[in-house]
Amino acid sequence: MSEKCAAVILATEENPSVTTYRSIYMMNLLSKPIVGWVITALRRCGIEDISVVVSDNDVTITPYVELLGCASYKRKQIENESIDFMKKHCEGNILVVRGDAPFIDPIVLRNALLEHENNGNEVTVVSTQVDVPFGYSRIVRGDSGELLSVVEEKHAAADEKKIREVSSGSYWFDAIMLLRSLETCVKFHKDAVDNAVNEIVAFGGKFGAYYADSPDIVLRASNRRRLLTLNEKARKNEILRHIEAGVDIPCVDGVMIESDVEIGVGTTILPGTILRGKVKIGKGCKIGPNTLIENSTVGDNVILNETQCYQSTVKNGCNIGPFAHIRPNSVVGDCVHLGNFVEVKNSSIDTGTKVSHLTYVGDSDVGKHVNFGCGTVTVNYTGRAKFRTKIMDDAFIGCNTNLVAPVTVGAGAYTAAGSTITEDVPDSSLGIARARQVNKLGWRINKDNE
């Protein structure tokens, strides 16, 4: 990638045929806004200077793209201030792309730039061939294959509409020539973006096309039916990417893997698994069925069965589930077992600890090789504030124990089943906090005789 390159994303169209409270550019593709896919592709292409042009009525795109470090301009603002805008980028090349085409390929963009520079073009369009060209601008060539023009669908003649080579909506421009064309467009009150190519050709600028083999680069979310198609396409693309990298996905039913997910070799993904956000999974794991992981890190040789995990870390060799829930800010150490109906929140659980069933561990720091009996609850909330529970190495927590924070159970200490522990239990001690059992002999006989 050349050092002096910038990109402009066009996200200005308002589509009344799409029933939504959000812009089409902000509709999700695998839980990520479409314009976010475009920004990611540009970053992978090596472009950091990215501006997004939005409609004058937009209220949803601007906050999102600015959060991603992109500049944002209203359409009327960019038309009125286009000259000043371009002068900021008057060296090098500028890439103009559509904001509703999520499958633009960074490799294609880089190769198109190389051809643009090597051929000395003032403008280079990225084109491809589609089976049904309706709705796309046609690439018109001469008898010897030379590029003559790019014609919009609404302006195309009958013979031009039969052409199957179409524009992807992505153009590399020489910045100085684009600046000159914009000056003319503004002077004649034309649409600066749509007419820039025609103005450059009128100036005698050199016009070229880079042909992309995959027609996916032109796919757009023009309506909800098309969005459904794009989602399925994106889902299959991600699944294939991981299969080719050595991940085992024997059945793809219900599997959804987002674009920022990393999965190690030899890991198996079972049906109903959803991997969302920035997820990193190690080697040799078994994930699923019916498991959701979001913005989390999972180590090697981990089993996650019927489990949900959010913004947490699960280290090597853990066996988790079924029906476990790992809530944000939790760290589950090596070889930890979390069984059925176990919930962990904002807690650290160290190596070899077993929490087998029906237990809540919240706001807690748990040591190594601790055993939790069934029905243990860390009572962390007073109604006004939350406190932490500390359980040291090799402790044994009896069934149906309530640990009322702030409280510490010492190393090697035990709590008796059914206890409500409100005071610290010293190391190697037994904490008993329950009423003494009383047996009333013959009570049933007397009751029946009443």
Feature names for model-found ranges:
Residues 2-62, 70-73, 109-115:
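N-terminal glycine-rich phosphate-binding loop and ensuing alpha1 helix
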Residues 167-170, 259, 387, 405:
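Glycine/small-residue-rich pyrophosphate-binding loop that anchors the diphosphate of NDP-sugar donors
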Residues 62, 66-144, 180-183:
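Conserved beta-loop-beta/alpha segment of the NTase-like Rossmann-fold superfamily
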Residues 304-450:
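Glycine-rich hexapeptide-repeat left-handed beta-helix
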Residues 201-308, 314-317:
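Extended, small-residue-rich solenoid/repeat segments and analogous flexible loops
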Residues 147-240:
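Catalytic-core segments of class I nucleotidyltransferases/pyrophosphorylases
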